[in-house]
């Protein structure tokens, strides 16, 4: 449910001319969500809405009236806890708008930057988009490339290759 709500807010922000200002401000608030005290204040029903607004305003040196109105809207609708999802969805929409997609390469060993760049170049050509890859270490012997936004997943497993080779050898015999 929160993802649907976050998607609507992010879509509205993405259509604004000052999307970057909103995004930067939301990132500031999003970074505070790792603090348990911050989350307690945001989620508390005992703290008045005006005090929450003052608290959130204290994070910013330059006041943006549009952003303040947005925060008031979130406070009124008790949706401040949706900020991390809004940031994530806004990042996704910005990337889609700029034709930039982030993918993950799962591998047993850390890949060199050169290998990642080589994969990025090949995927850029295949999808005609700007692909950025991150390496994630996994325990299995397979290599897997995930581009969630494009609905693309490629995996290569040594076990599967060995099984197919065994089947092929058995067929020949």
Swiss-Prot record:
Gene3D superfamilies, per database record: N-terminal domain of the delta subunit of the F1F0-ATP synthase (1.10.520.20)
Major location (coarse): membrane
Cell membrane keyword on record: yes
Protein location: Cell inner membrane
Bilayer topology: Peripheral membrane protein
Superkingdom: Bacteria
GO molecular function: proton-transporting ATP synthase activity, rotational mechanism
Any Gene Ontology CC annotation: plasma membrane
Keyword Cell inner membrane: yes
SUPFAM superfamilies xrefs: N-terminal domain of the delta subunit of the F1F0-ATP synthase (SSF47928)
Keywords: ATP synthesis, Cell inner membrane, Cell membrane, CF(1), Hydrogen ion transport, Ion transport, Membrane, Transport
Pfam families membership: OSCP (PF00213)
InterPro entries registered for this protein in UniProt: ATP_synth_OSCP/delta_N_sf, ATPase_OSCP/dsu
HAMAP family (alphabetical): ATP_synth_delta_bact
Its job: F(1)F(0) ATP synthase produces ATP from ADP in the presence of a proton or sodium gradient. F-type ATPases consist of two structural domains, F(1) containing the extramembraneous catalytic core and F(0) containing the membrane proton channel, linked together by a central stalk and a peripheral stalk. During catalysis, ATP synthesis in the catalytic domain of F(1) is coupled via a rotary mechanism of the central stalk subunits to proton translocation. This protein is part of the stalk that links CF(0) to CF(1). It either transmits conformational changes from CF(0) to CF(1) or is implicated in proton conduction.
Annotated NCBIfam families: ATP_synt_delta, PRK08474.1
Quaternary structure annotation from Swiss-Prot or TrEMBL: F-type ATPases have 2 components, F(1) - the catalytic core - and F(0) - the membrane proton channel. F(1) has five subunits: alpha(3), beta(3), gamma(1), delta(1), epsilon(1). F(0) has three main subunits: a(1), b(2) and c(10-14). The alpha and beta chains form an alternating ring which encloses part of the gamma chain. F(1) is attached to F(0) by a central stalk formed by the gamma and epsilon chains, while a peripheral stalk is formed by the delta and b chains.
Protein family per UniProt: Belongs to the ATPase delta chain family.
Protein name: ATP synthase subunit delta
Organism expressing this protein natively: Campylobacter jejuni subsp. doylei (strain ATCC BAA-1458 / RM4099 / 269.97)
Gene: atpH
């Amino acid at each position: 449910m929160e993802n649907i709500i976050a998607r609507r807010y992010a879509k509205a922000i993405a259509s604004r001319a000052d999307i970057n200002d909103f995004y930067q401000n939301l990132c500031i608030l999003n970074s505070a969500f790792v603090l348990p005290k911050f989350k307690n204040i945001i989620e508390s029903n005992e703290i008045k809405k005006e005090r929450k607004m003052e608290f959130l305003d204290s994070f910013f040196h330059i006041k943006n009236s549009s952003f303040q109105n947005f925060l008031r809207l979130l406070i009124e609708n008790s949706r401040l806890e949706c900020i991390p999802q809004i940031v994530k969805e806004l990042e996704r929409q910005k990337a889609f708008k700029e034709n930039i997609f982030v993918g993950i390469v799962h591998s047993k060993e850390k890949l060199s930057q050169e290998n990642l760049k080589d994969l990025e170049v090949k995927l850029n050509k295949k999808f005609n988009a700007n692909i950025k890859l991150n390496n994630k270490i996994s325990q299995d012997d397979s290599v897997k490339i995930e581009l969630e936004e494009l609905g693309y997943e490629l995996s290569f497993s040594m076990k599967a290759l060995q099984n197919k080779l065994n089947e092929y050898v058995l067929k020949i015999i």
